[in-house]
């Protein structure tokens, strides 16, 4: 994931679609073999299994809930690997210049892991039951906390991580592996950005068919918005506004 601050053909939505919908699909614009190579380097850094987690006894000795995510310049695997395949991709660069201007900069880059339920120890499942935004960082062993680990994330805006910042940034996601509906793909709500900033948790009702939401913000606005599941091949790139619910 990248948070990126202030003559291209946009796949699927186009630049006009970004303004209207609050997100843009660029498609599989990064070479798949290069994505495989990068993913292999990540996989070699640790065993992706239940061994990522502290034991209950270890956690209770010193429970920590703050600063458990990689930051810029601190405890961040993404800063130790060559990401030129993303950062120097011509389509990405030109897209960001179109949206943010020629002097855009990367605020943060990091790897995000969507954790399978079977990896998670039962005591952590119980401890996080009912929590809307389940960042598993507090339960991860310190030596593995250089990535972000999620499960069961409720709809939110990325502004939640930058409460004091003007929302002049976008979030850009790159799939390093093929992602289908069974692999916790991104689900976002096109046009939901039109309500602007809203505090978490958001007042949202999901339709029975899970194809739309009824969104009521704190200022009294209410509207139905469609949901879009973002599946794609390795190398697929998407980006969205700081206000887009996902």
Language-model regions, residue ranges each:
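Short beta-strand His + acidic residue motifs that chelate non-heme Fe in jelly-roll/DSBH
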Residues: 172, 245-246
